[in-house]
Amino acid sequence: MIFNGKETECVSVLGARVHNLKNIDVDIPHYKLTVITGLSGSGKSSLAFDTIFAEGQRRYLETFSAYARNMLGVLERPDVDKITGLSPVISIGQKTTNKNPRSTVGTSTEVYDYLRLLFARASDAVSHISGKPMVKYSVEKILSLILEKYEGKKIYILAPIVKNRKGHYKDLFEQYRKKGYLHVRVDGELKEITFGMKLDRYKNHTVELVVDRLKVSSKDEKRLKDTVELAFRQGKDQLLILDVDTNAISYYSKALMDPDTGLSYLDPAPHNFSFNSPQGACPKCKGLGYVNLIDREKIMPDMSLSIKDGGVLPLGKYKNSLVFWQIAAICEKYGCDLTTPLAELPEEALYDILNGTDEKLNIKNETLSTNNYFLTFDGLVKYIELQQDEESGSKAQKWAGQFFSRCVCPECGGARLNKEARHFFINGKNIAQLASMDISELRDWLADLHHHMEPKKWKIADEIVKEILGRLDFMLDVGLDYVSLNRASASLSGGESQRIRLATQIGSQLVNVLYILDEPSIGLHQRDSHRLIDSLKKLRDEGNTVIVVEHDKDMMLNADYIVDIGPKAGRRGGYVVFAGTPHQMLAQHTLTADYLSGVKRIPIPEHRREGNGHFIRLRGCKGHNLKNVDVDFPLGTFICVTGVSGSGKSSLVNATLQPIISRRLYRSLTEPLPYGEVEGLEHIDKVVTVDQSPLGRTPRSNPATYTGVFTDIRNLFVNLPESKIRGYKPGRFSFNAKGGRCEVCSGNGYKSVEMNFLPDVLVPCEACGGKRYNRETLEVKFKGKSIADVLDMTINQAVEFFDAIPAILNKIKVLQEVGLGYIKLGQPSSTLSGGECQRVKLAAELAKRDTGKTLYLLDEPTTGLHFEDIKILLSVLEKLVQKGNTVITTDHNMDVIKCADYIIDLGPEGGRNGGNIVAFGTPEQVANQKNSITGRFLKKELSEK
């Protein structure tokens, strides 16, 4: 391959036919930054991930033993003739976010591991009882201290053997009696060890063994030394000195110790600062930082209801059952009944209903025909906790789980670590405090640390700090200055988690690796895009090949090489329409090239809607980093919430507004972030969240089933004369139910053939030929087409086929209008891209009848979308707003922002420096706000009108 006039090695893909790829050949240069672009569904991911990465992964797994391959499961060979020049491949995608609650930004980047090492080697311990520095002495130092303090005095030397624990300790006393020890000190009182001696087993006891009683003299130092060493052996490196005259106690230890209280710590090791280790984790929350507690508000969400009307959610409405008879008895005890609204019940009655009572209740019920049936009541809380028990089934646990709320651990305050770990400090900060800092703040703190450390300790810390600073710099380079090390990995967006993995890879300093990234610019404000591009170039310059699936204009123009897949999507895509440098591409006339060169652009609306005069007003929002903000959302408009990454957009919309509305409209149990008050919810009757998650959890889900049109199609086939003659019901035409489906493949259309030590092979079902249905079902036809033929049609074909059946046509036509005419009606959702899934969901909403009072929430809807796809998306959103609905989207894409009616811009920065409303109003108004970073970029965009 010739690149910039020089011959270079490349990854050569020959005859790729994965998904919709049309037997394409393409060369991708080594040691360059290559962008693969094209419409959503054109075949970009099919080439990058399902062909190049899949083959690289398969080759890697083939180096394993046959046994290991069988255990791991082997990737199927992609449908490609040949791939040459393939170096080891690492994929950094969006869908691999770690959902483990123990995974944090710090653990996944290994920065926290280095911090643990730093604290194990260079921290200072402080007593969590007295707050004084812990000390550590050698045996020689302890001897000199004893001689200095007790010269000429009579003392007992004691070895601690039991510390504040329950038990009778009969065997322990007998063991020491046989060894020749005569006395012990039990709970501060000296006692002789007698035969059969034991303590109250149900009380906590502290026991010290009397090792020796002597008068301290420097002339008899050998006896003192022997006694001290013996006491250390018996007391596990700890001893006490009891002054015979004053009864004063002094503590000594070879480990870290508080001389005032006797508290001792083990010598710090890295695992002592790990919340994933028993030695470091908080005993209350087991290192999670939170505990799940039963929430009374979730059990009784609507206090205006009575118990009989379903006010107690776990019970539902009144049934003639024992639990209601028991609660009726409690109500009678407090002078009320089951029809009394919960808000009017005495607090004592509510307490007994929730927590139970030991008092025997007089059960009165006509069904029992008795008034003399007495029972105690354990309470709803205990019942729910029993359902949550590990021995309960998953269904019961899921049911019980809805009544729990996650609360910050009361013992560690969310730090995840035990008391000891939290009382080791470096320059006044413990490891949990450092982990809670923003990356930028932590970097500054560490960079200044050498000014605050003793030279001896800095010599130990220097290399560790350098390693941490290097990794933090990589995170700053990819725009993650606002996250903290203790941020849970599960809470990261796809783009954030991908950039964290990118920073980790840069830090690993691998060479000769092929990296494949899926839209790393997701969730990144335009201000930070150049930092990301510089990071990718740094990865390239270290001697790696970087392939990026991307639509970002800046990324494309800064690439070394561009591969444009198209010309359209689905069946009309899958071709390489251009491959070359950005400069060469600007001279072309592909769809992508036209948008890059400015020949095509998304138009700016002529007018901005002012809305219907109603507002949703949120007051006092202060969750996460929101700074007690007040915000108004004008209804009947297209609103865009903007701001740099980490400024609080998702906290405001997804974690505050959406749960508030869902609670009000649907009695949802999801807890919103803290806020003051909300007004205007009476002006909406429905909230719809449209994201890019898959349509369903299995490949059986498809556009026809999701939009509901498949039900209409099945009903059409059921009402055909042939079906009526045969007595077929709608279930006959479902591939999910027995009867009409092919039972050989269970309606899948294919069979998985196990090859033992080779990859499993998916082959079309020999019984149905991949059609999913049995022969009898396929004999029923409409206009010459069976149900399987209909599912195999593209949306465009189906629109023509069902042109005379409005019930079906209207739903399918909406799919066509949102730009999905190329996908099949029965296409498995697992093969749809994120952008395609989102548009299927939007189409399903457009097809529904609405009252014009629906609120649509979209989180970064442009993810995975080409310029042309964004144009189609905006036209769909326009239709929703024209019907009187409200659309709120959070996005960084300037094409979306410039088309909004109203903008709410958060900032000014991310993390702790964000969370304020810096600008609001029309795009033109925000563009003129000098303190708005978004406004600066918007001004440039609007000037190109």
Regions found by a protein language model. Give the residues of each.
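Conserved phosphate-binding elements of NTP-dependent enzyme cores
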Residues: 1-945
